[in-house]
């Protein structure tokens, strides 16, 4: 049976919106990951933290409606200069990485804390954790399926995480990963908060 016209128009609108977002994201991503020996810089615009997190959660819930994400963000107003499309993609990649690879996960958390003049982003899970021998090379793109446990957990992470690392590096920061004492893994990066350098 054909969908009602109103629903068809709504779906078409969502498809167009997602397509335009994807095109912009890919264009920005290509500018960050190009290999030409030049220093890569991103165009930063002050972004309200609440709006960024809401956008990430909305996109994530469309693909993973049954996966709850616990959020912990400051109550105060926070703006952060960034390329929001790329930072959204980093957070989405990290959340989806947990869904696909954190075997045994029952809790997924996205948190932001303020430390001095920085906003520290963390994506944490309570799943299987990351093999110790993989932690040092997990962002290099060389962590292939053969390096993962035989049961396939935490496999095929290298390419996506290397892109995350490139995006964060282009923002003047570094992404790290470590295993949690209580089980699972946490991925972390920090961005400068809004101030004198907004928009640069």
Predicted regions and their residues:
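Conserved micro-motifs of the catalytic ATP-binding
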Residues: 37-42, 79-82
């Amino acid at each position: 049976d054909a969908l009602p016209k109103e629903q068809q128009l709504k779906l078409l609108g969502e498809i167009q919106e997602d397509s335009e977002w994807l095109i912009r994201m890919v264009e920005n991503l290509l500018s960050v990951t190009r290999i030409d020996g030049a220093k890569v810089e991103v165009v930063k615009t002050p972004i309200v933290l609440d709006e960024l997190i809401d956008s990430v959660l909305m996109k994530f819930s469309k693909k993973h409606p049954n996966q709850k994400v616990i959020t912990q963000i400051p109550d105060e107003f926070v703006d952060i200069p960034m390329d929001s499309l790329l930072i959204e993609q980093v957070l989405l990649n990290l959340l989806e990485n947990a869904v696909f690879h954190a075997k045994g996960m029952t809790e997924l958390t996205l948190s932001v804390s303020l430390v001095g003049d920085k906003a520290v982003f963390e994506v944490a899970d309570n799943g299987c954790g990351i093999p110790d021998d993989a932690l040092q090379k997990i962002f290099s793109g060389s962590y292939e399926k053969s390096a993962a446990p035989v049961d396939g957990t935490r496999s095929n992470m290298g390419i996506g995480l290397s892109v995350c690392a490139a995006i964060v590096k282009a923002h003047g920061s570094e992404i790290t990963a470590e295993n949690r004492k209580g089980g699972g893994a946490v991925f972390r990066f920090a961005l400068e908060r809004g101030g004198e350098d907004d928009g640069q």
